Design a protein with these regions (language model features):
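Single-stranded RNA-binding regions, centering on S1/OB-family and related RNA-binding modules
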Residues: 2-264
Length: 264
């Protein structure tokens, strides 16, 4: 149907404005369709900088909704799903201790489950699945921990356990696992006093003894000659500082040591 030829200028103005709006809407729609969906998390710049990511935190309940409780995390709100509510329930204003990580959509989420390791810590984790991208490790919480192939010293096998350190991937902003411990451990000099007690995670049976990760940060060695019984790879044990070597690694003893040993 054609427009009348005697349409006045004032009558044509709304039509031009309406057409401009249509062109604008069409342009935005086409731009959105043309752009491929991002494979990165929805909020890596913000959530990866959150001081509670990968840690325990006591957070305040802001509001209760059918999916769960929303907790205050700086300028963000983090969901604690209802399945993690304590038996006595939650109310607005309550404080609850939670662990913060990312869900499958890259959003921060909270849980009361206990992960086997926090950010910066080392633990032996079991490989649940191996895909074309990497391995997924059982971590003690609802979401498995991803270890890319680049962070595997050898290709992980499903069902096997490996020592894994937790770090934040600088691209995705997510908590990620690495089996390349030497990239993350021993990058600073220890400052222990001889005789000081430390926690040692046994990670390797060496010809001279057992190589250990000390307090999740340093390399140490427990020597066969000092041990009355063999140790088990993957076990944690209290050890004692004998000395700090020139290479920054620690010599350890399995028992408290006396003054005579410290002077040798």
């Amino acid at each position: 149907m054609s427009h009348p030829k005697n349409t006045k200028k004032g009558d044509r103005e709304p039509a031009r404005q309406f057409g401009a709006c249509l062109r604008k809407i069409t342009f935005l729609h086409e731009d959105e369709v043309a752009s491929p969906p991002s494979r990165l998390p929805a909020q890596p710049p913000l959530s990866s900088q959150n001081p509670y990511l990968g840690k325990w935190a006591a957070l305040e309940v802001l509001r209760i909704t059918p999916p769960g409780a929303y907790l205050a995390v700086d300028t963000e709100e983090v969901l604690l799903p209802r399945r993690y509510f304590p038996e006595e329930g939650l109310q607005e204003g309550d404080l609850i201790k939670v662990f913060i990580y990312h869900d499958n959509e890259g959003r921060l989420i909270a849980t009361t489950l206990h992960p086997y390791a926090l950010l910066g810590e080392v633990a032996f984790l079991e490989t649940k699945a191996v895909t074309k991208e990497g391995a997924f490790m059982a971590w003690g919480i609802h979401r498995d921990l991803f270890v890319p192939f680049a962070e595997q010293p050898t290709r992980f096998a499903q069902g096997a356990s490996y020592p894994i350190v937790i770090y934040i991937d600088h691209i995705s902003g997510r908590l990620t696992g690495s089996g390349e411990l030497r990239k993350h451990i021993g990058n600073e000099l220890p400052n222990y006093i001889p005789g000081e007690a430390v926690e040692a995670l046994i990670v390797e049976n060496h010809e001279r003894g057992y190589r250990a990760v000390v307090d999740h940060r340093y390399w140490g060695m427990l020597y066969h000659s000092d041990l009355e019984v063999p140790l088990t790879v993957g076990s944690r044990t209290t050890s004692y500082i004998v000395r700090t070597r020139e290479d920054g690694k620690l010599d350890l003893a399995p028992n408290p040591i006396g003054v005579a040993r410290l002077k040798t």
